[in-house]
Amino acid sequence: MTTDTPPPKPGLTYAEAGVDIDAGNTLVDRIKPAAKATSRPGVMSGLGGFGALFDLRAAGYADPVLVAATDGVGTKLRIAIDTGHVDTIGIDLVAMCVNDLVCQGAEPLLFLDYFATGKLDVAEAATIVEGIARGCATSGCALIGGETAEMPGMYAKGDFDLAGFAVGAMERGGALPANVAAGDMILGLASDGVHSNGYSLVRRIVERSGLGWGDPAPFEGRTLGAALLTPTRLYVQPALAAIRAGGVHGLAHVTGGGLTENLPRVLPEGLGIEINLGAWELPPVFRWLAAEGGLDEAELLKTFNAGIGMALIVAPDRAEALADLLAGAGERVAVIGHVTEGAGAVHYRGTLL
């Protein structure tokens, strides 16, 4: 009695497993011009190597200290994915990293991104990376490398995730915060909307409202999705100009935790902050979120930027000149408070709502 030998199973390929290396190579070729456009003094290599090279001396530094920051965009990505509007989400990614760097007194020099998805859509990924490149160019930092990860089975169809990593530098002795003292004034720079924090609550409020992303926003003329995808403002160049002008003792990027949690991060022991909530107008998007979500003022101030995206703590005798400098650079500036004697908390005077 003979036993039939089963035919051999056909060989598998990586592409059949769901990973298209050719698509990845196509993406790299497509984004090279955008990355090249961000080049700056110090860049020694382009995309495609095993690592990226940067020459700090060529960038003008004599005795540099490096500063690194990494971040993502959070669940704002969900709105970008659901609406298909992904052209500015890369700007958010850059802003979340480089705005943090400048708070340490550092000039952003280079940026790397991580893009992960279940199935690579070259056109979509290129649009996202081109947004990253625009953010880098605005901030004066080079998009020097990155990683595109196509991972079948790890993400739902159409979903993706982003992470960014930025490196900056300052000359030794230039780190901030420094010399923060009672009586220092706080300059608030206006935000361009919700920026990139609090979106889990935003999405819950939108769900409660019964509105869709394509419906008109109740607080402005665009669709709700477009309004909520307004990219995070990049404060790097105006903030660096203020630092170089002298008198800046500290900066706080107002992200998750709002003014309530972020301002104390730049305070030494024994000092507090008083904020005058009447110093600026609460933007309509936050007024709508508060009303629709039933948020009290404390929740609003601890979750969202509430209209102030960056705060600078400055010497009192430099406040007016620095406010003029920042306004001349295109920022909307308000004197929103001052540093006080006391233990590390933020105290609010007046009301926003």
Swiss-Prot record:
SUPFAM superfamilies: PurM C-terminal domain-like (SSF56042), PurM N-terminal domain-like (SSF55326). Pfam families: AIRS, AIRS_C. One of its GO terms (cellular component) is cytosol. One of its GO terms (biological process) is adenine biosynthetic process. It is found in: Cytoplasm. One of its GO terms (molecular function) is phosphoribosylamine-glycine ligase activity. Pathway: Purine metabolism; IMP biosynthesis via de novo pathway; 5-amino-1-(5-phospho-D-ribosyl)imidazole from N(2)-formyl-N(1)-(5-phospho-D-ribosyl)glycinamide: step 2/2. Its EC number is 6.3.3.1. It comes from the Bacteria. Keywords: ATP-binding, Cytoplasm, Ligase, Nucleotide-binding, Purine biosynthesis. It catalyses: 2-formamido-N(1)-(5-O-phospho-beta-D-ribosyl)acetamidine + ATP = 5-amino-1-(5-phospho-beta-D-ribosyl)imidazole + ADP + phosphate + H(+). NCBIfam families: purM (TIGR00878). Belongs to the AIR synthase family. This is Phosphoribosylformylglycinamidine cyclo-ligase. The gene is purM.
